[in-house]
């Protein structure tokens, strides 16, 4: 049992998507057998449920362990076109600057033009490739809006090499009976329907790239839903399912990869909203996750797809985070 738990997070275990899926199916069957034979009182199947809930991360190459490993990415992203949703947010802006520093042309998506322009200026001031600004309110976006995004990127860049989903809307927290339909609709639009809509619209551009990747930013509340989290937890659960579906559908497409990261608690406006009494200064900065996202974007994982990386565990195993030289 313990060995299986360790295997589920092993960064060096060799397994492709089919092997991972077979392992999950075996665990699911075994979980049912354990529950039937031993009864619900022991609840041993919870060990397997934890694996089934998209927490399996079996990479054939080691994950980066510190920001100093950014030296291993010298302009690795040069010439690539990378769309980052929610680019003006805490995590999104870190990823935008990091990708631009590695030579990528970053498409900065956000809702507030002023914030996107400020990030645009920072990227240019650092002498990185000129980014593209993409203002779009995902809470009201429709299918034709995503089609227009695809058309504009096709005209301007010809392809999209990577999409990193960080845009998020918390919505309202509280008992279901006190949550409005409109709040749920807006949250589901931003957190679930928009990733689906963008993926669907941009798939031809991803296929035009020689090595395309998609990275979802997930949340433990989607894997372990609890009271009062409402539409946010439902949307994040749906996003985990979308990731698994895409990985399965793209299994035989060598140039397409999709993976996810569950960062865990970090210093962000979202955390300040959900835990207003906490001192978020004591939490990890979004910067510490940059090497992990760059690794997934860069193509270094090759055919690795369908994995979800537990950011908290990765941080515990990582070396001290020192800024790159």
Task: Give the predicted meaning of each segment.
Residues 61-64, 256, 260-261, 268, ...:
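C-terminal helical subdomain
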Residues 88-89:
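Conserved glycine-rich cofactor-binding loop
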Residues 104-118:
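Conserved glycine-rich Rossmann-like NAD(P)H-binding loop of the short-chain dehydrogenase/reductase
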Residues 126-142:
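Rossmann-fold cofactor-recognition segment
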Residues 149, 174-176, 180-185:
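Substrate-binding pocket helix/loop in short-chain dehydrogenase/reductase
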Residues 166-172:
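Conserved NAD(P)H cofactor-binding loop of Rossmann-fold oxidoreductase domains
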Residues 207, 211-252:
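Catalytic loop of short-chain dehydrogenase/reductase
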């Amino acid at each position: 049992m313990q060995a299986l738990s360790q295997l589920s997070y092993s960064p060096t275990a060799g397994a492709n998507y089919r092997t991972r899926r077979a392992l999950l199916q075996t665990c699911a069957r075994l979980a049912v057998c354990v529950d039937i034979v031993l009864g619900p009182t022991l609840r041993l199947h919870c060990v397997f449920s934890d694996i089934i809930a998209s927490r399996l991360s079996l990479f054939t190459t080691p994950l980066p362990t510190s920001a100093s490993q950014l030296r291993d990415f010298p302009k690795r992203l040069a010439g690539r076109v990378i769309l980052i949703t929610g680019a003006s947010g805490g995590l999104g802006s870190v990823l935008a600057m990091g990708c631009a520093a590695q030579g990528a042309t970053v498409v900065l998506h956000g809702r507030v033009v002023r914030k996107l322009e400020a990030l645009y200026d920072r990227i240019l001031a650092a002498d990185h490739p000129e980014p593209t600004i993409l203002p779009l309110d995902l809470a009201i976006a429709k299918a034709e809006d995503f089609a227009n995004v695809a058309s504009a990127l096709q005209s301007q860049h010809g392809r999209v090499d990577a999409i990193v989903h960080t845009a998020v809307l918390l919505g309202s927290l509280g008992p279901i009976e006190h949550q409005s339909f409109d709040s749920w609709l807006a949250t589901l639009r931003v957190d679930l329907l928009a990733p689906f809509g963008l993926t669907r619209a941009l798939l031809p551009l991803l296929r035009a790239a020689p090595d395309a990747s998609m990275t979802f930013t997930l949340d433990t509340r989607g894997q372990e839903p609890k009271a009062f989290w409402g539409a946010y937890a439902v949307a994040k659960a749906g996003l985990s399912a979308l990731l698994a579906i895409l990985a399965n559908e793209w299994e035989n497409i060598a140039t397409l990869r999709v993976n996810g990261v569950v960062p865990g608690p970090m210093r962000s406006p979202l955390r300040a909203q959900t835990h207003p009494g906490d001192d978020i200064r004591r939490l990890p900065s979004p910067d510490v996750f940059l090497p992990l996202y760059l690794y997934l974007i860069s193509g270094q994982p090759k055919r690795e797809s369908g994995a979800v990386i537990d950011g908290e565990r990765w941080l515990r195993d990582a070396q001290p985070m020192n800024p790159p030289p």
